[in-house]
């Protein structure tokens, strides 16, 4: 067993006379030259067979002059002396592993390694690994591409040695990595992926507003807005068809507030529908205003005067604010052709805040001459408002003369079109002109 471990031993005996000088040097009790310890590794220490108890003299092995003394300043503690019973005159050039009774002492730096074995020729001195990849063993040129034939990937060949380097900060954009090469002017350039501008565009748009920015962008699309408007109009049409009374509730609201100078539903409903159709949302209410002219105005001037007087009477009485926009409707008769009379409605809008005043007229409805003459005959000669018209309206005459005819809506009996529809058409045209003249912030 001892021979297998590489230690030459002899039975204990009296040293020969030729080695007397050596035995004197062996009188020391400590080993002068420390033997390299065995580092902790999975390999187990060689097992020695038990030997009989003999005196364990200490000996020192002369170190050749060519061997440098160990550099480690950390003393090693041995559990026991080597089981050697004798000394030899020739120096033993074999390394003997020794067992430690304590853990391996920590090395102060990566460059501290165990001393080389005691051979005639000193072993190579180990140094720290290089900080740059080794380039020896192969030649490089500026025209050689190491990525050729690897589909853009780094080749797994000895040309790309594995080495460890300091952590590299990850940059947001692709960069060109260059490995420094000593003694060469060329560099290794990795392929750089082109930057996609769409990625930054999407990122900027997403960070600007997130999900709300996306919704805002979709809602601002003209095509999407048109589809939404059509859908809204379709839903409102279905609701108002099933229940016509719901129209005023659906479209009531917004910044547009209009007062109609009448409490008659035929006028208020027509103006409400017209302004809500043009502005989308509008609040339209009615107040009873007085015209202060004859009940049946005659001529354009009288009709316009009656409509304006209704607005002024409401403002004088304080029923509406002086700056309140108002719409007034006044019907009159006029002889447009010889012995041909027509009923016409005058519709005006007055907005003192923005200085807007507009007029519009409904379509002319023919009135038979005999009914006009009856209205003139029922009016006294000394009537104080004779300058503005007649004291009896054409509707009252028609109601007396014809069955199933109403004084307020006799137009449908003569034309098939109701008075409300006529006022609605004129009011819608008036609302369109009014909208064009309003500042954008009101809309």
UniProtKB/Swiss-Prot annotation:
Gene3D superfamilies named among the record's database cross-references: 3.90.950.10
Main location as per UniProt: Golgi
Region (Disordered): 1-25, 106-129
Entry's localization field: Golgi apparatus; Cytoplasm
GO molecular function: protein kinase A regulatory subunit binding
Keywords: Cytoplasm, Golgi apparatus
Name listed for the protein in its UniProt record: Protein PRRC1
Source organism of this protein record: Xenopus tropicalis
């Amino acid at each position: 067993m001892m021979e297998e471990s590489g230690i030459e031993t002899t039975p204990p005996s009296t040293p020969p006379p030729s080695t007397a000088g050596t035995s004197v040097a062996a009188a020391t009790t400590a080993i002068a030259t420390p033997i390299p310890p065995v580092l902790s590794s999975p390999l187990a220490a060689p097992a020695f067979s038990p030997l009989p108890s003999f005196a364990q003299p200490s000996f020192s092995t002369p170190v050749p002059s060519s061997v440098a003394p160990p550099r480690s300043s950390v003393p090693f503690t041995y559990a026991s002396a080597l089981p050697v019973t004798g000394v030899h005159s020739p120096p033993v050039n074999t390394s003997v592993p020794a067992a430690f009774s304590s853990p391996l002492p920590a090395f102060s730096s990566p460059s501290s390694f165990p001393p080389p074995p005691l051979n005639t020729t000193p072993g190579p001195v180990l140094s720290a690994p290089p900080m740059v990849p080794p380039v020896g063993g192969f030649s490089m040129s500026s025209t050689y591409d190491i990525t050729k034939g690897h589909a853009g990937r780094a080749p797994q060949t000895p040309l790309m040695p594995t080495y460890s380097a300091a952590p590299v900060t990850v940059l947001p954009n692709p960069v060109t990595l260059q490995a420094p090469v000593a003694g060469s002017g060329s560099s290794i350039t990795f392929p750089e992926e082109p930057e996609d501008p769409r990625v930054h565009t999407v990122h900027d748009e997403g960070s600007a507003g997130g999900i709300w920015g996306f919704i805002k962008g979709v809602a601002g699309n003209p095509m999407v807005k048109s589809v939404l408007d059509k859908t809204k109009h379709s839903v409102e049409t279905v609701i108002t068809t099933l229940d016509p009374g719901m129209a005023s509730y659906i479209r009531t609201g917004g910044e547009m507030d209009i007062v109609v100078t009448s409490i008659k539903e035929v006028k208020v409903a027509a103006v409400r529908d017209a302004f809500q159709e043009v502005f989308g949302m509008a609040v339209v209410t009615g107040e009873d205003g007085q015209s202060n002219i004859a009940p049946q105005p005659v001529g354009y001037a009288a009709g316009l005067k009656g409509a304006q007087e209704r607005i002024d009477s409401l403002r004088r009485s304080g029923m509406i604010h002086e700056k309140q926009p108002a719409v007034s409707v006044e019907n009159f008769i006029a002889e447009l052709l010889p012995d041909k009379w027509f009923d016409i409605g005058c519709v005006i809008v007055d907005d003192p805040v923005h200085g807007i005043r507009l007029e519009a007229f409904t379509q002319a409805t023919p009135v038979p001459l005999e009914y006009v003459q009856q209205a003139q005959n029922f009016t006294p000669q000394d009537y104080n408002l004779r300058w503005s018209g007649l004291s009896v309206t054409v509707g009252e005459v028609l109601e007396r003369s014809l069955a199933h005819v109403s004084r307020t809506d006799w137009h449908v009996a003569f034309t098939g079109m109701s008075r409300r529809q006529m006022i609605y058409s004129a009011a819608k045209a008036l609302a369109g002109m009014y909208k064009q003249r309003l500042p954008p912030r009101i809309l």
